Amino acid sequence: MTARRWTVGVDFGGTNVKAGLVSPAGRVVATRLLSSKAVSRPARFVEGLGRAVEDLARSVGSRPGELRGVCVGAPGSVDVERGVVHGLVNVPGWHRVPLRRLLERRLGCRCAVDNDANLFALGEFTFGAGRGAQCLVCLTLGTGLGGGLIVGGVLHRGVSGAAGEPGHMVIDPDGPRCGCGN
């Protein structure tokens, strides 16, 4: 099997960054785990993820430039067309970061960046419990809260890219602050 058919999927969470080497059949065959704190700044993230992707590619006798591509799911606002992360609620220092460009330069292969909950919804729709469904709502609950929405077999991002994202409100004005600042 040629390396150009393998991809790497990355889940950038508020606690951990998980990178998985994905076979052409959609199976995760190898993973690497990084602490989000260790790669909290964009330059550290690109370098740390670069090393993880190199290691994953080597595990199938390849190099990153020979992979089909790398896709990062980020827990925040993402301009999918330009590959720019506008902000991450639980990870400071991420404002208007051209992550796709930085990763493509580092890895030498095609890269994509999207909201993590949108990618979760697409994954379930394509390979998981949502396979065959025309409408699907996926909610992520971890360090943060997110949502992805598929209607009529199409991922919906909405005008501002936040379709499917659940809102939240202050319950106790004197309570602890949320990662969003409220």
Regions found by a protein language model. Name each.
Residues T2-W6, G20-S23, A30-L33, S40-F45, ...:
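Glycine/GP-enriched mid-protein hinge/lid loop-to-helix segment characteristic of carbohydrate kinases
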Residues V8, G76-V78, I150:
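Assembly/interface hotspot detector across virion components, adhesins/toxins, and nucleic-acid enzymes
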Residues D11:
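Conserved catalytic-loop position in the HRD/HxD motif
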Residues T15:
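Conserved Rossmann-like nucleotide-cofactor binding loop
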Residues K18, V80-R82, G147:
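Glycine/Thr-rich phosphate-binding loops of Rossmann-like dinucleotide-binding domains
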Residues G26-V28, R82:
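Short coil turn/linker residues within repeat-based beta-strand modules
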Residues S36-A38, P42-G50, E54, R58, ...:
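Glycine-rich phosphate-binding loop and adjoining helix at the ATP-binding site
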Residues P64-G65, G158:
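A short alpha-helix-loop-beta-strand transition element characteristic
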